[in-house]
Regions:
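Small/aliphatic-rich secondary-structure junction motif
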Residues: 3-48
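Structural beta-alpha unit
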Residues: 73-107, 132, 144-146
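Short, solvent-exposed amphipathic alpha-helices that sit
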Residues: 21, 59-71, 94
Length: 146
């Protein structure tokens, strides 16, 4: 039923809960897993961090790659085929486009991510993916309070 599973991550506790659910689902279906993290670089351009020659965009890409690498290691440890990628741009549209590109059968994501402003029940990225995507979304609730 599920041959290709997309697990977006941002390293948050909610994403970690979703990752565990996604790994369990992939194991049950012997599915291929795609791990993605979106570096939402937005209008930062070549903004430099104080005392650092690294641009804010480069720092975001680096953090995104760390999140991807950590989850790829966990998926590999579960004995599953996995591909990891860092996407750039608005997370909502990038995740939907990538899911279509890889032919995902399901997207497994958390109720919310690292965003500074929390919505009452669900994060804006998750909400957007559910509302505007054509691919089924499994939302894993971490059970923690906002």
């Amino acid at each position: 039923m599920f041959d290709t599973i997309l697990i977006p991550t941002d390293g948050s506790d909610h994403a970690e809960t979703a990752a565990e659910t996604g790994i369990e689902l992939a194991t049950a279906h012997d599915a291929t897993v795609h791990v993605a993290c979106v570096a939402d670089t937005g209008p930062l351009g070549d903004l430099r961090l104080p005392g650092d020659a690294t641009s804010a965009e480069d720092a975001m890409r680096g953090r995104a790659q760390e999140h991807v690498d950590a989850l790829v290691d966990r998926v590999e440890a579960a004995g599953l085929d996995v591909t990891g990628t860092v996407l750039e741009g608005p997370p909502e549209s990038e995740l939907l486009e990538y899911a279509q590109e890889i032919g995902a059968d399901v997207i497994v994501m958390g109720t919310r991510g690292r965003g500074g402003v929390h919505r009452m029940a669900m994060g804006s990225v998750t909400d957007h993916v559910i509302r505007f995507g054509e691919i089924p979304v499994l939302v894993a609730n971490s059970g923690s309070n906002p």
